[in-house]
Amino acid sequence: MKALHFGAGNIGRGFIGKLLADAGIQLTFADVNQVVLDALNARHSYQVHVVGETEQVDTVSGVDAVSSIGDDVVDLIAQVDLVTTAVGPVVLERIAPAIAKGLVKRKEQGNESPLNIIACENMVRGTTQLKGHVMNALPEDAKAWVEEHVGFVDSAVDRIVPPSASATNDPLEVTVETFSEWIVDKTQFKGALPNIPGMELTDNLMAFVERKLFTLNTGHAITAYLGKLAGHQTIRDAILDEKIRAVVKGAMEESGAVLIKRYGFDADKHAAYIQKILGRFENPYLKDDVERVGRQPLRKLSAGDRLIKPLLGTLEYSLPHKNLIQGIAGAMHFRSEDDPQAQELAALIADKGPQAALAQISGLDANSEVVSEAVTAYKAMQ
């Protein structure tokens, strides 16, 4: 099996590319960074530091690389069985024309073996968005052929890849946490389903997208907000504070109760998933700053995001939410010299008061009981 992966950055090399190469797939990276391309083509291998309770070094081998803006990448798309991406949501649109050219070439060469394309980005249904960009770049006479022979497969990805703490200047060396999750929508594949260790197939992708948002993202944000208020520097320091840990774990259990009601997740398995995430926050190798994780509080307090969306779920199913309320109050206190949203939040609260400010940011009813609970918690933290 042959694969082309767009994006030879830390996530590309340390997560998706590693899983593909470890599965024995013939892998080519596509990127614009000439230093990385030259190093990959000179060595055909690189080292990945996998850090958890212990550290191990894995070698990924048998890889090569091409420029993502040349003709080679177009030729490869005409030949490979799988295309994956880890380029960041904004860059998907930029790689679409090259993919479209490659698909036209594939059609012209009469290659009708199925091709599947999977965007592995931190966004909801990223491949569907990539498909839209590719379709816009295709000539009309190629669109029906692409619909028939090319699968655009959505996925959910989760692995923390911190800034490398390596003492070397090796452009290929990368550090990743032990945990990784790559869940793909099996209903969208063309041809046989691939068997790639570390890739999980599901017919209910949105359940897993929400599970990550309501657990990892909710817990991470609340740890950051309460940690900053308590004077902690890192996520690890904050989660080792018993008072903060109790609220974070409680909030993840509250959001988890929503997931169990909504999607039928197994309660014991979800409790184990929460424990695993608490362990990830404690990882001594991931020096995650509370200020970095807390950034953009207006976005994180919006209706569809990690704090308000699970709260709305607790209201929908009449479930408890006192710890989620503590997290929301903590977010309202977030102040950072370097974050424009933190400054805007402070100005809004100063101008309108906490009740009207929270209602405006979150879309919650200003006169609702939950807004009143959040304001009470906010004032108690002052």
UniProtKB/Swiss-Prot annotation:
Q: Which InterPro entries match?
A: 6-PGluconate_DH-like_C_sf, 6PGD_dom2, Mannitol_1_phos_5_DH, Mannitol_DH, Mannitol_DH_C, Mannitol_DH_CS, Mannitol_DH_N, NAD(P)-bd_dom_sf
The alphabetized UniProt keywords are: Acetylation, NAD, Oxidoreductase
Q: Which organism is it from?
A: Escherichia coli (strain ATCC 8739 / DSM 1576 / NBRC 3972 / NCIMB 8545 / WDCM 00012 / Crooks)
Annotated GO CC locations: cytosol
Q: Which residues bind NAD(+)?
A: A3, L4, H5, F6, G7, A8, G9, N10, I11, G12, R13, G14
| N6-acetyllysine modification, residue list | K269
Highest taxon, organism lineage? Bacteria
Entry keyword Acetylation: yes
**In Gene Ontology terms, what is one molecular function of this protein?**
mannitol-1-phosphate 5-dehydrogenase activity
Enzyme Commission identifier(s): 1.1.1.17
Q: Name one GO biological process term.
A: mannitol catabolic process
Entry coiled-coil feature ranges: none
Known catalytic reactions: D-mannitol 1-phosphate + NAD(+) = beta-D-fructose 6-phosphate + NADH + H(+)
Q: Tell me what this protein is called.
A: Mannitol-1-phosphate 5-dehydrogenase
- Extract the SUPFAM superfamilies matched here: 6-phosphogluconate dehydrogenase C-terminal domain-like, NAD(P)-binding Rossmann-fold domains
- Family assignment? Belongs to the mannitol dehydrogenase family.
Gene behind this chain? mtlD
Q: Which cysteines are joined by disulfide bonds?
A: none
The secretion signal range is none
Pfam families xref list: Mannitol_dh, Mannitol_dh_C
